[in-house]
Amino acid sequence: MFFRNLTLFRFPTSLDFSQIDSILPNARLRPVGPLEMTSRGFISPFGREEQEVLNQRQGDFLWLTVGSEDKILPASVVNDLLTRKCSEIEEKKGHPPGGRERKRIKDDLIHELLPRAFVKKSRIDAMLDLRYGYVAVDTASRKAAETVISEIRDLLGSFPALPLNAEISIRSMLTSWIAGEPLPEHLNLGDECEMKDATEGGAIIKCQHQALRCEEIDKHLEVGKQVSKLALILDDHVSFVLGDDLVIRKLKFLDGMLDQLEHSDTDGIRAELDARFALMSAEIRRLFLLLEVPLKLSKANN
C-alpha cells in the first residue's frame, strides 16, 4: 500500500474531524443496485472484507478510502441491440421508429441489460494531513480526485477543500531548475522531463532515462521551450514527477525510506499496513512542506 500519484487540495485546519468514526458507517459503500449504473461510498482502507474499521488515523494523518461499484455496459452493445430492434420495427411497420420512440427503446434495453451487467470494483485512497490542511488523493485524474472530495464533503456536510494552486508560474520554476538554478534543499533532478513550446499547440519534447543537465536540454531551452513535467528525487527516499498542474505522478518510495520498514514491528498484515501508512504520510508531508515555500502554494482560509 503506497500511493502512486498525488492530486492535492487545501482545506482549513480548523475543521473538526472528531466525529469521523461515528458518521462513517452512514456513508459506507452499498452494493450497486440491479437498475443502478454506479454506487460510491467509504470502505475500509484495509480492504472490503474489513467491516468495522472504515478509516485509519495516526496522529494528524487520516486515511480514507472511497470504493466504487460500476456497471460495465458498453455503448457498442446497447447500440447494436438498438439497431437490431429498430430494424425489426421498420420491417413490421414499414418505417423506422421516430426519435422519441427510439429513445424509449434504448431506455428499455438499458433497463433490461443492467441487472445482468458485470460490476467493476475500484477504490481511491486519500490521506488528510489535519495539521497542515491538505488532502493527497492517490490519483493523477483531477476528475477522480474531485469525486473523492465530493464524498468527503457529503460525509461531513461541509468540506471547503480547493484544488492546490500556486502564486507563481510552475513552468517557469521547473524550467529554472533544469537550467541550473539551485533546487530546494534535499531535492535533486531525476532522469525525466517534458518540455513544451511556449506557444499553444507547439512541439512537445519528452526525455526519459537521461541526464537532464546536458547540451541537448540546453538547446531546447535556448529556443524557448519550457518544462511542463520534471522528475525529482527527495534525498534517497522518494522519486516523483512534478507537473505544471501541480499533480505529482510516478510517486515511488525508495530504499532510504523502505529500509525503515525492516526495523519496525510489522507482525501481521495490519501492522505492516499501519507502518507503511505512517512512513508514507511522513514523507508526503515532508515533500509538501519542502515544495510549499518555493512554489508559493496556496493556503486555505480558516
Swiss-Prot record:
The keyword Cytoplasm applies. GO terms for molecular function: double-stranded DNA binding. It is found in: Cytoplasm, Nucleoid. GO terms for cellular component: bacterial nucleoid; cytoplasm. InterPro entries: RdgC. Its main location: cytoplasm. GO terms for biological process: DNA recombination; regulation of DNA recombination. Keywords: Cytoplasm, DNA recombination. May be involved in recombination. Belongs to the RdgC family. PANTHER family: RECOMBINATION-ASSOCIATED PROTEIN RDGC. This is Recombination-associated protein RdgC. It comes from Xylella fastidiosa (strain 9a5c). The lineage of its organism: Bacteria, Pseudomonadati, Pseudomonadota, Gammaproteobacteria, Lysobacterales. The gene is rdgC.
